Design a protein with these regions (language model features):
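ATP-dependent NMP and nucleoside kinases share a basic, alpha-helical "lid"
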Residues: 114-123, 129-165
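Short, acidic/turn-prone active-site loops that include or flank metal/cofactor-
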Residues: 55-58, 154-157, 176-179, 201
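Well-ordered beta-strand positions
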Residues: 49, 148, 192-193
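ATP-dependent small-molecule kinase phosphotransfer cores
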Residues: 55-128
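Small-molecule kinase domains that catalyze NTP-dependent phosphoryl transfer to phosphate-bearing small molecules
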Residues: 116-117, 125, 143-144, 165, ...
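Glycine-rich phosphate-binding loop of ATP-dependent small-molecule kinases
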Residues: 1-86, 213-235
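An amphipathic alpha-helix signature
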Residues: 68-72, 156-164, 171, 175
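Residue-level signal for inorganic ion chemistry
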Residues: 35, 54, 105, 130, ...
Length: 235
């Protein structure tokens, strides 16, 4: 029997999307071993929301992660550990020497990472958001999602020493990873602000303190300009 009420009723209007408050976003980046995580933790201690795209990538490639079915379908079952998580060592071997395979992996991960990070940004309550993207400068449009770029910088010799100490990788392996990233000069050329992370923690904290105050002012100014443009990002 046909339900004439349903058949003749006007289509239901979709629920309105929740209001998303525009956020002033600082893109945090730096080379491997530069100390991005330490800097991010300093900002978190000040109550700033930090969204780490590396952390999101680990979450979606853990056992049961939303990215794993597509990854296994594209690369085969040997890229997964017995519990269903991504075998990171195996995947590194596949994508490091083959740009096509790397692009394939990125085509799976990047849309998911972006969707999750955008959702988390929309829920942030802090005056501004720190969006940690290790390969921000290497992306095609580094300023597409951020209003300000903060680079964590240190000498390349310091990077190598730190990564070897924490990971056990050989010096040659660390250098090969660094060679696949933007150069120190390329990152600094794109930076709106720089944290020099080759001193002690007190020096690092002092730099964060100063930048935090500056970012609060910039975020307030930007938000006021955004409001005057009807909620759109100011030019």
């Amino acid at each position: 029997m046909t339900n004439t009420l349903d058949a003749n009723a006007a289509p239901a209007k979709p629920d309105p999307e929740p209001t998303r408050v525009k956020r002033w976003i600082v893109g945090l980046t730096g080379g491997i071993g530069s100390g991005k995580s330490t800097v991010a933790a300093c900002f978190q201690e000040k109550g700033i929301t930090v969204i780490d795209t590396d952390d999101i990538a680990h979450r979606i490639t853990a056992a049961g992660g939303v990215a794993m079915p597509a990854i296994i379908s594209s690369f085969g079952g040997d890229v997964a550990t017995p519990d269903g998580a991504l075998n990171r060592q195996r995947m590194r071997e596949i994508v490091f020497e083959d740009p096509r395979q790397r692009k394939k992996l990125e085509s799976i991960l990047h849309p998911m990472i972006r969707e999750i990070s955008e959702r988390e940004i929309s829920l942030a309550a802090s005056a501004y958001v720190l969006l940690a993207i290790p390969l921000l400068i290497e992306s095609d449009h580094p300023r597409e999602r951020v209003q300000h770029i903060l680079v964590v910088d240190c000498p390349e010799a310091t990077q190598i020493e730190r990564v070897m100490k924490r990971s056990g990788l050989s010096e040659e392996r660390v250098k090969s990873i660094m060679a696949a990233q933007a150069t120190r000069e390329q990152r600094l050329a794109q930076a709106d602000a720089v944290i020099s992370n080759h001193g002690n923690l007190a020096d690092l904290q002092a730099q964060v303190d100063s930048l935090h105050e500056d970012f609060l002012t910039k975020a307030e100014t930007w938000f006021g300009a955004s409001a005057s443009h009807g909620g759109q990002s100011p030019p």
